[in-house]
């Protein structure tokens, strides 16, 4: 089953180590909405939990995180969203 663009954004941030609170701040959505998106991703991918969902999505879309980094000029140190 295909993920929505917002679900892809959420699972990408989960894969990058963002907490639910950080995802909400970054995407300007509530904590509850973040949880809803994560729950939908887990169901769609038939995963056991969020970590398993990331692993499944990474397996299906092998270049997914690399493309995200290239498109957004991210580095591993660029995630200080709560310190703004």
What is each stretch, according to the model?
Residues 1-3:
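Short amphipathic alpha-helical boundary/capping segments
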Residues 43-84:
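Basic, Lys/Arg-enriched C-terminal extension of HTH/homeodomain DNA-binding domains
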Residues 16, 28-31, 68-75:
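Intrinsically disordered, low-complexity Ser/Thr- and Pro-rich stretches
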Residues 19-52:
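Recognition helix of helix-turn-helix DNA-binding domains
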Residues 14-18, 57:
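Short helix-to-turn junction characteristic of helix-turn-helix DNA-binding domains
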Residues 12-15, 63:
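Poly-acidic low-complexity segments
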Residues 12, 25, 55:
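A cross-family signal for key residues in well-ordered alpha-helices
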Residues 6-7:
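The N-cap/first-turn positions of alpha helices
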